[in-house]
Regions:
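Short, aromatic/basic amphipathic alpha-helical patches
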Residues: 120-131, 147
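N-terminal "first-domain core" detector
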Residues: 1-44
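C-terminal single-pass membrane-anchor helix
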Residues: 169-220
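ADP-ribosyltransferase catalytic core
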Residues: 52-124
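Juxtamembrane amphipathic/hinge helix adjacent to a transmembrane helix
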Residues: 147-173
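Short acidic-hydrophobic, aromatic-tinged amphipathic segments that line or gate anion-handling sites
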Residues: 133-142, 157
Length: 220
């Protein structure tokens, strides 16, 4: 299998950040490790301690700064992450492109997204601290439209040319499999819950048909 393509930045993608620090001194952090990102528009340089030592993004590693291509699913994902700040990453240096996103050698928050129920004073302070644009948007659709209008992110045809149409098809097939697995697991969970409710209520009449959100459930 060929290695994922490396392309030069800048490339833009969607991601989220955590927030740490006292009021007035907040800093954006990586949502996984919690490492602070440098303010003032500076680029964060990705590092990796996995041996053998290499420069991020490594082809056989998961290192680098991660972001999603601007798509409906990714916009919903970043806007729906509780306790995190959605935004747009400006990636530079070597960038390894994948069907759903990319990993970059370095990057900075180019824009932060303030949603209708977001903390406006906090986002205003963070945008000023990071010299980032503050986008006041009403949801994922508006974020995706902003990216399309301003030419931010790699389009699906460009990604397909970079990673190959076969890998794109494989990626879509894998996402469909994951959706089916989730739906099947959720259905099993609902059946178990329905069974628990029936067992927990000794006054339930056997043979009775119960109506719930998932449809009819017949009491054995």
């Amino acid at each position: 299998m060929s290695e994922p393509p490396l392309v030069p930045g800048p490339i833009y993608g969607l991601r989220t950040w955590g927030v740490a620090g006292e009021p007035g001194e907040e800093r954006l952090t990586g949502p996984q490790l919690g490492a602070p990102w440098p303010p003032g528009g500076a680029m964060l340089e990705a590092t990796c301690d996995v041996r053998p030592l290499h420069e991020p993004p490594g082809a056989d590693c998961d290192c680098g700064l991660h972001a999603f291509h601007p798509r409906r699913a990714s916009a919903r994902r970043v806007c729906g992450m509780r306790g995190q700040v959605p935004g747009i990453l400006e990636a530079a240096g070597a960038v390894e492109v994948h069907p759903d996103g990319f990993r970059a050698a370095r990057g900075r928050p180019a824009a932060l997204v303030l949603l209708p129920r977001g903390n406006a004073p906090l986002l205003e302070r963070l945008a000023a601290a990071y010299d980032a644009e503050l986008l006041r948007l009403d949801g994922p659709g508006a974020l995706l439209e902003h990216c399309r209008t301003h030419g931010l992110g790699l389009s699906e045809p460009v990604v397909a040319e970079l990673v190959g149409h076969e890998r794109m098809r494989e990626g879509r097939a894998e996402r469909r499999r994951l959706v089916r697995r989730f739906a099947a697991g959720w259905a099993v969970f609902l059946v178990l819950v329905a069974g628990y409710v029936v067992v927990a209520n000794p006054h339930t009449q056997h043979g009775k048909v119960l109506h719930g959100r998932t449809g009819e459930v017949r009491v054995p």
